Regions:
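Alpha/beta-hydrolase
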Residues: 141, 145-148, 152-256
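Short beta-to-alpha linker loops that shape the active-site pocket of alpha/beta-hydrolase fold enzymes
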Residues: 62-66, 131, 263
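Catalytic active-site module of serine/aspartate enzymes centered on a nucleophile-bearing elbow/loop
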Residues: 253-290
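Conserved hydrolase catalytic core segment
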Residues: 97-137
Length: 290
């Protein structure tokens, strides 16, 4: 652990949004800064993981439309290329690249876009379980299933949409057209509200869910970048869409995913899925230090 540490919060102004980010700076560190990103998970979701890297400068942020980062039009969809521009600007303003990146879920998809557009920003990328439906062998039904989640949210609100999301993300194995056509479950099954608050700007279930999961990465640009990219898949989430996304992306890059302890959110203590934050962080460190 380095002897000096300072923490700052700042904002970047981008077309259509103001994006908030945090830097815990450790000037004496011998390591590159580590950026922890998700989508729609913001900075608060990485507090537990960040504690394991007290020898590095840590950069976290809230993606536009989530937590502290407001969009001018909350109903608009935001795709990975726009998130990549935001990430690039944050990296520049936080001191410049290259940085190491741990990216979770939709953040891993945004990180692939960052590597493609700004190849010198990232030294090592650990991309954990990108739910990239467009890259799956069953892309057609997978994309249809994501569209069904969004349709449920649009029609019935957050509780119904979240219940449908849980049903889909818990499913193991290839998806089918028949599964995509199934209605979502009763929200009460998952303790979700049955009422509709009328809001349709949720950063997970709103229009961005389609822009993120159906994204088509520039694979040639990703492969050409100097970034060392490691895909991660959870030992407890085998067969689930995001886990399968890690395998599909790794195949595109000519590699195999590294298995991580726990499930999709294995870096956080959870009562909902298997997790082992200490072992998870150790795996991230092993990759970054290799």
């Amino acid at each position: 652990m380095t002897e000096t540490m300072s923490q700052t919060t700042d904002t970047i102004t981008m077309p259509g949004a103001k994006v908030v980010y945090d830097v815990v700076e450790r000037p004496g560190s011998a390591h590159l800064p580590l950026m922890l990103i998700g989508q729609p998970m913001g900075a608060s979701g990485f507090a537990e993981l960040a504690k394991h890297f007290d020898d590095r400068t840590i950069i976290t942020y809230d993606p536009r439309g989530a937590e502290r980062s407001a969009k001018d039009d909350p109903m608009s969809a935001t795709g990975p290329d726009t998130h990549a521009d935001d990430l690039h600007k944050v990296i520049q303003q936080a001191g410049g690249g290259p940085v190491d990146v741990f990216a979770s879920s939709g953040g891993a998809i945004n990180a692939l876009a960052l590597v493609a557009k700004y190849p010198n920003d990232v030294h090592t990328l650990v991309a954990h379980e990108p739910p990239l439906a467009s890259a799956l062998p069953d892309a057609g039904p997978a994309v249809a299933t994501v569209k069904a989640i969004h349709a449920t949210y649009e029609q019935s609100g957050w509780g119904a949409g979240m219940a449908h999301f849980i049903m889909v993300t818990s499913q193991r194995g290839p998806l089918t057209a028949e599964f995509a056509a199934q209605p979502g479950p009763d929200p009460q099954m998952f303790g979700m509200p049955t009422g509709d608050d009328g809001k349709r700007s949720d950063p997970l279930l709103g229009p961005s869910i389609l822009a993120i999961t159906t994204y088509q990465p520039d694979w040639d640009a990703v492969r050409a970048a100097p970034t060392h990219i490691v895909l991660g898949a959870g030992e407890a989430s085998d067969g689930q869409m995001a886990n399968r996304g890690a395998h599909a992306v790794a195949q595109q890059l000519g590699s195999e995913p590294v298995m991580f302890p726990g499930g999709h959110g294995g870096f956080n203590t959870s009562e909902w899925e298997p997790s082992d934050p200490d072992a998870f962080a150790a795996k991230v460190r092993d990759i970054l230090d290799a």
